């Protein structure tokens, strides 16, 4: 449990209030661990196979070690004593915390992949939205500035940050102005943002990102492409062409670059997530 954090505690249950669904076969969600806390009485707890057969039975009380239920593990409370008092607590990995607790979209996978190699320092989340990347990085100890044009999104970010006791600089900002405030940053992050800008401002926006990156600092960009083999199905104001993003970073150390297929959370008329190529770049300034 060292790498897990609690994101939700259920109310105290008694024999009368123990929810019926927990007495039937069910499983935890993807990325969710669960643990019972027993204050009084005892519970017969069954781990189940997918076909409903019992794989293990344990008798739990206030003094016995309580097993952690793994994600998607089938189980049920088979029996509870009349004097039972207990509650359930849910855990997740740190990168899933804000998604689980506040309903956020998960921290972008490229941010998660890049973070271990980037030292703590000043981070600019350019086009932060509600802060799925900002909050995660701030929780790890980065000094985060979040800029976005959408004021309601920034307000939600500030509210969640306040609830979590996180300190972030949050300001409204029009990225197309290409006039980043706040001096130099050690890491500038822009995930799924640039395709919402007009094509004519892209060179200035990228140059502005680069000029506000400290020596030895990093830029991470993920943005939509439209290619011959995979025309973008969304009418974004801008999409990168093959090799275009990479050309902007001539002279930088390219730590990662690809034009792989990816998906939006947005779906088509059949409920399938929209799939096309994204330009993904992680580069270090010399």
What are the language-model segments listed below?
Residues 50-71:
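Short acidic-glycine-tyrosine-enriched beta hairpin
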Residues 203-215:
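A short glycine-rich, Lys/Arg-flanked "PGG" loop and its adjoining helix->strand segment in the class I
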Residues 70-93:
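Ligand-binding loop in jelly-roll beta-barrel domains
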Residues 92-118, 124, 129-168, 172-180, ...:
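Class I (Rossmann-like) S-adenosyl-L-methionine-dependent methyltransferase catalytic domain
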Residues 11-31:
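Conserved short histidine dyad/triad with adjacent acidic residue
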Residues 34-44:
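Short, conserved beta-strand element in jelly-roll/cupin
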Residues 187-201:
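A short SAM/SAH-binding and catalytic strip from SAM-dependent methyltransferases
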Residues 180-188:
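A short acidic, Gly/Pro-enriched loop at the edge of an enzyme's catalytic core
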């Amino acid at each position: 449990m060292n790498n897990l954090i609690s994101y939700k505690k259920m109310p105290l249950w008694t024999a009368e209030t123990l929810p019926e669904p927990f007495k039937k076969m069910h499983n935890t969600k993807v990325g969710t661990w669960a643990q019972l806390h027993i204050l009084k009485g005892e519970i017969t707890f069954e781990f189940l196979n997918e076909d409903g057969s019992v794989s293990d039975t344990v008798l739990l009380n206030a003094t016995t070690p309580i097993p952690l239920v793994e994600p998607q593990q089938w189980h049920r409370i088979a029996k509870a004593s009349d004097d039972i008092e207990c509650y359930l607590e849910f855990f997740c990995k740190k990168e899933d915390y804000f998604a689980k607790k506040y309903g956020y979209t998960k921290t972008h996978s490229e941010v998660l992949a890049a973070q271990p190699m980037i030292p703590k320092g000043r981070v600019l989340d350019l086009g932060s939205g509600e802060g799925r990347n900002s909050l995660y990085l701030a929780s790890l100890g980065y000094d985060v500035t979040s800029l976005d044009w959408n004021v309601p999104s920034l307000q939600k970010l500030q509210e969640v940050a306040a609830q979590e006791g996180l300190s972030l600089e949050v300001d409204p900002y029009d990225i197309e102005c290409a006039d980043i405030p706040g001096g130099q940053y050690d890491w500038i992050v822009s995930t799924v943002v640039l395709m919402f800008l007009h094509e004519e401002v892209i060179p200035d926006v990228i140059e502005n990102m680069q000029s506000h990156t400290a020596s030895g600092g990093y830029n991470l960009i993920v943005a939509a492409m439209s290619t011959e083999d995979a025309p973008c199905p969304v009418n974004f104001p801008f999409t990168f062409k093959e090799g275009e993003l990479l050309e902007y970073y001539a002279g930088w150390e390219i730590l990662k670059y690809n034009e792989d297929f990816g998906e939006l959370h947005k779906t088509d008329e059949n409920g399938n997530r929209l799939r096309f190529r994204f330009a993904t770049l992680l580069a270090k300034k010399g």
